[in-house]
UniProtKB/Swiss-Prot annotation:
It holds the Pfam family ATP-synt_8. Belongs to the ATPase protein 8 family. F-type ATPases have 2 components, CF(1) - the catalytic core - and CF(0) - the membrane proton channel. Component of an ATP synthase complex composed of ATP5PB, ATP5MC1, ATP5F1E, ATP5PD, ATP5ME, ATP5PF, ATP5MF, MT-ATP6, MT-ATP8, ATP5F1A, ATP5F1B, ATP5F1D, ATP5F1C, ATP5PO, ATP5MG, ATP5MK and ATP5MJ. Interacts with PRICKLE3. It comes from Didelphis virginiana (North American opossum). This is ATP synthase protein 8. Disulfide bonds: none annotated. It is found in: Mitochondrion membrane. It is a single-pass membrane protein. One of its GO terms (molecular function) is proton transmembrane transporter activity. The keyword Mitochondrion applies.
Amino acid sequence: MPQLNTSTWTLTISLMIISLFCIYQLKMMNQTLIQITPSTEQSKLTKHTLPWEKKWTKIYLPHSSHQQF
């Protein structure tokens, strides 16, 4: 039964850990976890228009009791 050659495993695992660390650091550079100085643009409240606000909707009154003639 042939033996498994594990001589390159150390190098492979080391490079994998280093590359994962680098990828993680690059991803975290783009994230803002704590905002130190608030920007004025974000402090302004913007009104979001919803699709149903653009349309005219009919508002019905509740049903009245039966009218007797």
